[in-house]
Amino acid sequence: MTVLRTRSAVQHARELNNFLSCAAPLSLRSHSRPISGFNRPPPNYPGHVPLNFVERGALAVGSAVGALLNPRRADLIAACGEATATPYFIYRLRDAMLSDPTGRQILRDRPRITSETLKLPYLRSLPENTVGRTYATWLDREGVSPDTRDNVQYIDDEECAYVMQRYRECHDFYHAVTGLPIFVEGELALKAFEFLNTLIPMTGLSLFASVRLKPAERERLFSIYLPWALRSGLRSKELINVYWEKVLEKDVGELREELGIERPPDMREIRRMIRMQKKREKELMEQRGQ
């Protein structure tokens, strides 16, 4: 989905914590010692917000509905991703990293993707066909930054929390190598691909937002981009195991081939051509009416 990248993390945490504090029934909140099944466990790492069963369920449902109503709410999308990734899916992704040499190295090194760690001015100076230049060009074209990803809060296992953080910070690389833009139609196409590659539930649930697309956009999504996502998502390697920081100088076409990713049709170009066609048709209609 298209993300609104300017929401502060502090505001995000405050809103979600207020929501969770209201989610539990009053009868449970009024007891000084609630029954153990509803106790909130202690945090496992800095910034961790442990949730009990009721809170996790409320967060999953509330954030999913809120994100569907407003696909630009990046904070709700992130919360939904964390709340629905456990108990199975994030562990499966972690195990995929543990079973791969590069994945294990990433888990040992725990790199973070920011404009400082990637040195964006350097990436802009790389040859045009490199992964790093493609990534920097995509960031500049879409007007986004790698510095605005929320930190993971609601995943209990500390190692799995890093896996989710890594997925979140690598998301823009997936955009860059596929060329998909950040408006809703492009995000949904990428989320479909990500679901088949990662099995993270939030990525699949995102497709419900297709009901908010215009008819032409929805038809294009289902006829062009979902078939592409199916082909590429099922045959591509686990993208979580790509050490992006080490392939920045690699040819992007060569990397796509190695990963098994087919580049989809240029969505921006398709939309531009449709606009031009409609403009010409309108001009012809006006000329005939004179």
Curated annotation (Swiss-Prot):
GO terms under biological process: ubiquinone biosynthetic process
Catalytic activity line of the entry: a 4-hydroxy-3-methoxy-5-(all-trans-polyprenyl)benzoate + H(+) = a 2-methoxy-6-(all-trans-polyprenyl)phenol + CO2
Keyword match ATP-binding: no
Mode of membrane association: Peripheral membrane protein
Cofactor field: Zn(2+)
EC number: 4.1.1.130
Pathway: Cofactor biosynthesis; ubiquinone biosynthesis
GO cellular component terms, semicolon-separated: extrinsic component of mitochondrial inner membrane
Keywords noted in UniProt: Lyase, Membrane, Metal-binding, Mitochondrion, Mitochondrion inner membrane, Transit peptide, Ubiquinone biosynthesis, Zinc
Pfam families tied to this protein: Coq4 (PF05019)
Residues bound to Zn(2+): 171-172, 175, 187
Subunit: Component of a multi-subunit COQ enzyme complex, composed of at least coq3, coq4, coq5, coq6, coq7 and coq9.
Family: Belongs to the COQ4 family.
Protein name in the entry: Ubiquinone biosynthesis protein coq4, mitochondrial
Gene: coq4
